[in-house]
Amino acid sequence: LRLSGISAFSEKADGEAFLAENHGARETSLFLDGGRQTYRDGVITIRLESALKSPVTGRSPVDAPEILLKPTPFIQSDHPKIRTQLAQIVAPDAPENEKAKRLVSWVHKNLEKRPVLSIPNALETLEKRTGDCNEHAVLLAALARAAGIPADVEVGLVYLDGRFFYHAWNVLYLRQWGGWVTADAVFGQMPADVTHIRFVRGAIDRQLDLIGLIGNIDIEVLEAGS
């Protein structure tokens, strides 16, 4: 991974926008354009959600398919243990934004952060209370779906200690906000800072699109805002 112009970032920069020119990543099968991230003429622009439109109250989640509320083999949002843990974290009648913030904070504070050599599994992560970014993401997705919040996993790169690394985080659909909001339980962020570059969104099968890509791209930072 080669970087240039990266001195414009401070550690875990949380500015409103930055642009990265993508010299190596092919557009095929990647989700580079959508939500807070745009892709035009080889340039990715990412804007923090607070820099976009103001929250819209009462807007229906037309962009949040019903499937993002349902359990999967690895995001077991209907399991009794997941639902019991949810009840211990936040009240069922709490505002949606408050639910999301509490869930992000709980996963951030209660999971030991270390690599796990297995397919990320929300239930197993809840039981073992340990994992890397993938485990944080699937557990947050399961808790959010159990709370009635459409949730998915995003995968790409994140900037840390002067370099970009593979990373996974979440996107939550909040009706009170009026759209998708990123969340990173590893760093306890909602929204996630703008150094998160999304390549794909979805379950483990979508992440297979990244094989051969991570570690073989060059990113040139064109602009960083604060």
Regions found by a protein language model. Give the residues of each.
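Solvent-exposed loop/turn segments at secondary-structure junctions
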Residues: 110-113, 133, 158-161, 189-190
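Generic beta-strand/beta-sheet core signal
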Residues: 47-51, 152-156, 173, 183-186
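Short, glycine-/Ser/Thr-/acidic-enriched flexible segments
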Residues: 24-25, 50-53, 158, 177, ...
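Active-site rim recognition segments
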Residues: 60-62, 146-149, 164-226
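Intrinsically disordered, low-complexity N-terminal segments that are enriched in acidic
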Residues: 1-56
